[in-house]
C-alpha cells in the first residue's frame, strides 16, 4: 500500500507521496490510472518527495502530469510540497531548500499559512526556454493554420507562452491552448497563459497546462505572465494575479533577479492505495 496526501493550491490539485520513508516507483501507466477522477485518486499532478541529491539541500522535488509525463517545475505544487514535508515531520524547518530537474528552489512557510517560493530567475534566452527564435524579443509571432498569435515566451523552470486578451471569460482557452501547447517552435511543448490586464498591478489569468489542459491555477504560469507583462512595460514590480481558483501575489525586481510567488497550500485528506 502507498500512503499519500491529497492537497491543492488554489484548486490546482495534487497527490503528494513521501518517497523518503516509503520505497515507491510509479510507471506512466500507473500515474495515468491514479490521475483518473472516476477510477483513481484524481489530480492535475503527482508530486514525489525524495531524499536530496545534494547534501546542502533538504529534498528533491519531482512532478508528474496527469498524462504520466515528468515535468520540470510546478509552482502551486511547490507550496504544497513545503506544507507536506512540515506536516509529515520530514523537516522542522520553515525555510526549505529543494532541487528539481531544472534547478534549485527555496520555499518559506509563513505564520499565516501561506508559502513564499523563490522561483529563481526567469529565463528569456530562447534556446534555454526552449523556443525557436533568433534573438530575445518582448513579443513573438506564433503562426498556426488557424491564426497568428502575438505572445511572450519565457521559462520559469518550465516553458511558458503568454497571450494578452481583452476578455478572459470569453477566450477559447481549450481550443487555442491545444493548438499552441505542441507548437513546433516549442520543442518540449509549452504551457499557454491567457492574460487580461486590469491595471499595472493586477491581472486576470487562465492557463492551459502542457499535459494537463486548463487548470484552476498555475503557479509558474502566474509568474510567467507577471514577468512577461513587466518585460513588455505593461506591469509593475508587484502584481496580483487572479486565477479561476484564487489569487497569487508575484514580486519581481526585474531581469537577472529571482522572482517570488506567495500563495496558499491546502491539505484535503490523507489516504492509501494499492498500486
Curated annotation (Swiss-Prot):
Belongs to the diaminopimelate epimerase family. It catalyses: (2S,6S)-2,6-diaminopimelate = meso-2,6-diaminopimelate. Catalyzes the stereoinversion of LL-2,6-diaminopimelate (L,L-DAP) to meso-diaminopimelate (meso-DAP), a precursor of L-lysine and an essential component of the bacterial peptidoglycan. The record marks 269 as: Important for dimerization. Its EC number is 5.1.1.7. The active site is at 74 (proton donor), 218 (proton acceptor). HAMAP family: DAP_epimerase. This is Diaminopimelate epimerase. Pfam families: DAP_epimerase. One of its GO terms (biological process) is lysine biosynthetic process via diaminopimelate. GO terms for molecular function: diaminopimelate epimerase activity. The keyword Signal does not apply. Disulfide bonds: none annotated. Keywords: Amino-acid biosynthesis, Cytoplasm, Isomerase, Lysine biosynthesis. Pathway: Amino-acid biosynthesis; L-lysine biosynthesis via DAP pathway; DL-2,6-diaminopimelate from LL-2,6-diaminopimelate: step 1/1. Substrate binds at residues 12, 45, 65, 75-76, 158, 191, 209-210, 219-220. Homodimer. The record marks 160, 209 as: Could be important to modulate the pK values of the two catalytic cysteine residues. The keyword Protease does not apply. It is found in: Cytoplasm. PROSITE patterns: DAP_EPIMERASE.
